[in-house]
Curated annotation (Swiss-Prot):
Effect of deleting the gene: Cells lacking this gene are unable to degrade salicylate.
GO MF annotation list: FAD binding; oxidoreductase activity, acting on paired donors, with incorporation or reduction of molecular oxygen, NAD(P)H as one donor, and incorporation of one atom of oxygen
Name recorded for this polypeptide: Salicyloyl-CoA 5-hydroxylase
Biological source species: Streptomyces sp
Domain of life of the organism encoding this protein: Bacteria
Gene: sdgC
Principal EC category: oxidoreductase
Cross-referenced Pfam families: FAD_binding_3
UniProt keyword list: Aromatic hydrocarbons catabolism, NAD, Oxidoreductase
Length: 517
């Protein structure tokens, strides 16, 4: 059996090693256009709870993290000059170049042929191989060549991001939110060695343009960094990194693209890692996902009784649902980062801002499992400003008073637990009553219409909007438009348990939470 891997990233190297180990008679060749020590990017980060499948196949990653990486338990959120910390997160990171070096050693020891500075330009060059694994990254050329079969799609985020390192040593995963003269910028930062931290910066397109950071020529040769942006961000974040410099490595602005493919295989060609799928870096490690792909593909191919087509079908059958779950869970987090400037400016209390951030993908209860003391502090903050806990706090608007934040919903009435009701009418563009229903869209493409309806409702002087229909994410985005852009109270209607309802109110996403009669 002859197997070619296009790309010597972690996924490709790990797959080649595992396959060669399980099938020593196979000829496994890795083609890589760059040199062995060429590495773009800085560190790779992993959650402690997600490494079991990789470790079971080969402990190389755990060994790299233990011997060469950095480990931490807390996440820190910096905003408005204050710092909020939450524990129980259990994460580790290592320099990408170090991990690649160890993976190259493993592959070499198993007898994998690694051909560096050897770029495959024509698929015909690999005609004599029985299997070709395409692991050439998110911008995969071969995925594009076989686009009719793979059916690739990309959802491009509106936010801009750029990847740097810094010699300032963060002590764990830290999110730094900085309001500057041109807009709000935020950094995802974490240590990757004893002398370097990763420093990823995001901002919205308008702030990026106002700061004059749109002048970098994307045709600049690979490897060169955007020095103007580097200087700007060093100055903007100077106090946060104690004047330390940023370190560039092919650092240039981009928009994150969530990539999917209708099929992961085309004949003997199969996609692996970022070539097949991506998930926003705020919740998913592309390296981890690629290495898990490698484990699954090597396992299905390792059984001699199974043909290559059967193995590829089983690989996709096993991995696709797991990957899609990660991508789906990443969407609320990606959306948060597309709107974080609004949140920085809307939430004056660092406690509520941090809780809003930390619950973008999980509810209060799951956060409490990780750090009960932190959630107790958030609850205490609420109690200092209100009469009772989030769901037990009375709600007042105009002449109406409801005893709690839980309501029952009908077509023309929003009813409190004591039977008190707020009259509701559907949005119609005509004069409104006390409250107006806004129907959230089923997809984010429909949000502009719903947000326009919120604006018209606010301008008409109504007391409250109720948001129903749509998805959990679009309902929240419509409600936040009302609350944060127009200071208009919002009720969200859905099948919410008390934990999720508490999270919505405590985080400032909604004022009332209801279910239908």
């Amino acid at each position: 059996m002859k197997v070619a891997c296009i790309g010597a990233g972690p996924g490709g190297l790990f797959f080649a090693t595992l396959l060669k180990r399980s099938r020593p008679d196979a000829e496994v060749v890795v083609f890589e256009r760059n040199r062995p020590d060429d590495t773009f990017g800085f560190g790779v980060v992993f959650s402690d709870a997600t490494l079991d499948a990789i470790d079971a196949a080969d402990p190389v990653l755990s060994e790299a993290l233990e011997k060469h990486g950095r480990h931490w338990d807390d996440i820190e959120v910096r905003v408005h000059g204050e710092r909020e910390r939450v524990g129980g997160m259990g994460m580790a990171a290592v320099v990408r170049k170090t991990l690649l070096s160890l993976l190259q050693e493993r592959a070499r020891a198993e007898g994998v042929q690694m051909r560096f500075q050897d770029e495959v330009r024509d698929p015909a060059e690999l005609d004599d191989f029985d299997l070709v694994v395409v692991c050439d990254g998110a911008n995969s050329r071969f995925r594009t060549l076989f686009a009719d079969d793979f059916g690739p799609t990309a959802e491009v985020a509106s936010a801009k991001f750029i990847w740097f390192g810094t010699t300032y040593m963060f002590d764990g995963l830290t999110f730094v939110h900085q309001d500057g003269p041109h807009g709000v910028f935020a950094a995802h930062a974490y240590p990757i060695s004893d002398s370097l931290s990763t420093f990823i910066v995001e901002t919205d397109a308008d702030s990026w343009a106002r700061a004059g950071l749109d002048a970098f020529d994307p045709a600049t040769p690979l490897g060169m960094s955007d020095e103007k942006t580097k200087s700007y961000l060093e100055d903007l974040f100077r106090a946060q990194i104690d004047g330390h410099p940023l370190v560039g490595n092919n650092s240039r602005w981009a928009n994150f693209a969530t990539r999917r493919a209708r099929s992961w295989r085309s004949g003997k060609w199969v996609l692996l890692g970022d070539a097949a799928h991506t998930a926003h870096f705020s919740v998913g490690s592309g390296t981890k996902m690629a290495m898990e792909d490698a484990v699954a593909l090597a396992e299905t191919l390792g059984e001699a009784s199974r043909s290559v087509p059967e193995a590829l079908d089983l690989y996709e059958e096993r991995r696709r649902p797991k990957v899609e779950r990660i991508q789906n869970s990443a969407r609320p987090s990606l959306s948060w980062w597309e709107h974080f400037g609004r949140y920085v400016r809307s939430f004056d209390a660092p406690t509520q801002f941090a809780f809003h951030f930390l619950t973008r993908s999980i509810p209060r209860g799951k956060l409490a499992v990780r750090d009960a003391a932190y959630v107790d502090r958030v609850d205490g903050w609420w109690l200092r400003h209100h009469e009772a806990g989030p769901l037990k706090t009375p709600f007042r608007v105009g002449p109406y008073r409801l005893p709690t934040r839980r309501v029952t919903v009908g077509d023309d009435l929003l009813t409190g637990t004591d039977g008190t009701g707020i009259p509701m009418v559907p949005f119609s563009g005509q004069p409104f009553g006390a409250g107006v229903w806004i129907d959230a869209p089923d997809t984010e493409e429909g949000l502009p219409l719903a947000l326009d309806q919120v604006r018209e409702t606010a301008e008409a002087g109504v007391l409250l909007v109720g948001v129903r229909g749509g998805t959990a994410l679009t309902r929240v985005l419509v409600a936040e438009e009302a609350r944060l852009a127009h200071s208009l109270p919002a009720a969200i209607v859905g099948a919410y348990d008390d934990d999720t309802a508490t999270t919505l109110v405590l985080s400032g996403r909604a004022d009332l939470v209801g279910g239908t009669k």
